[in-house]
C-alpha cells in the first residue's frame, strides 16, 4: 500500500465526488440542524491543514464510519452506539483530560486548552479491527507525541496509559460487566511518540460524533482498533505497562501490543484476511496494517507471536 503525503492528494481524489460536494455544502450551511442531533455546536466544521501521512485508498462512506462501531460503553452491537448516543451521550462539552504520572507538568486541562496550541491535521488512515473487518477513515487530529511533550515526561516514563470516561448515566453499556470499567489502554512511550500516532478530534472534516469517541480519542493505525481508545479523560505516564481492559478480560486473546499481524491468528479466527466494509470480497491483511515501513523498526528483535 502506498502511503504518501496528504499534500499530494486533492480532497476530491480522496472522497467520491457526490460525498465531497455534499460535505462542502454541509459546511457552507453551517450544519446546525444535523450537529444539534449530536449535541455538538453548530461551528463543528473544523479548520484543518493536510497532514504528512495518508493512504491513497478510497475512504469508507461516512454513513458506515458513523453507524458501524465498536464502543461497548454504548452497547455491544455494532448499531448500538449510533442508536443510543442521541439519548444518552448527548454532551461532550465541557470536557477535561487529567495528565499524571512520570512527568514534570501534570495537571487537568480543558478540551480547548489541550487542543488549541496545536494545528489540526487531516490524515487518511486504514483501520483494522481485531474482528477481521476494516475501514479507511479520514481523521482530523493532532500528533500524539506533540501533545505528550508539553507535559515533559521524565526518564521513568516508559509507557503511556489512557482512560475512557466512566459515567453509566451517559454511557449505559457500563451498567453491564462486559469488561472491568473504565476502559484502559496503553502504549510504549516510543509508540506514543511515533509521528503516525494521532489524537483525533474529528473525521470527514467535522467534529467527532459521540459514537466515534467524542470529543477526543486515540488513533494508532498499525494496531488493531481496540487499542484506539475513545472519549479519553486521563493520560498517565508510567514506568511499567498497564494491564489493559481487554488483557484483563481475555488475556489469551488480547495482548498489550496488538500490532496487526496476519501471521498471528486470534485463537478463534484467522487474521490473514479482512472484510473491508462496503466490499464483497475479502482482502489480504498487511503486516502492521500496511505501515511496516514506518513502524517495524520499533519492534526489531522482538518475537511478535509472543508479544501479540
Swiss-Prot record:
Mo-molybdopterin binds at residues 69, 72-73, 129, 164, 212, 217, 228-230. Predicted to be exported by the Tat system. The position of the signal peptide cleavage has not been experimentally proven. Binds 1 Mo-molybdopterin (Mo-MPT) cofactor per subunit. Pfam families: Oxidored_molyb. Its cofactor is Mo-molybdopterin. It is an enzyme of class 1 (oxidoreductase). One of its GO terms (cellular component) is periplasmic space. The keyword Oxidoreductase applies. One of its GO terms (molecular function) is oxidoreductase activity, acting on a sulfur group of donors, quinone or similar compound as acceptor. Part of the MsrPQ system that repairs oxidized periplasmic proteins containing methionine sulfoxide residues (Met-O), using respiratory chain electrons. Thus protects these proteins from oxidative-stress damage caused by reactive species of oxygen and chlorine generated by the host defense mechanisms. MsrPQ is essential for the maintenance of envelope integrity under bleach stress, rescuing a wide series of structurally unrelated periplasmic proteins from methionine oxidation. Heterodimer of a catalytic subunit (MsrP) and a heme-binding subunit (MsrQ). This is Protein-methionine-sulfoxide reductase catalytic subunit MsrP. It comes from Paramagnetospirillum magneticum (strain ATCC 700264 / AMB-1) (Magnetospirillum magneticum). The lineage of its organism: Bacteria, Pseudomonadati, Pseudomonadota, Alphaproteobacteria, Rhodospirillales. The gene is msrP.
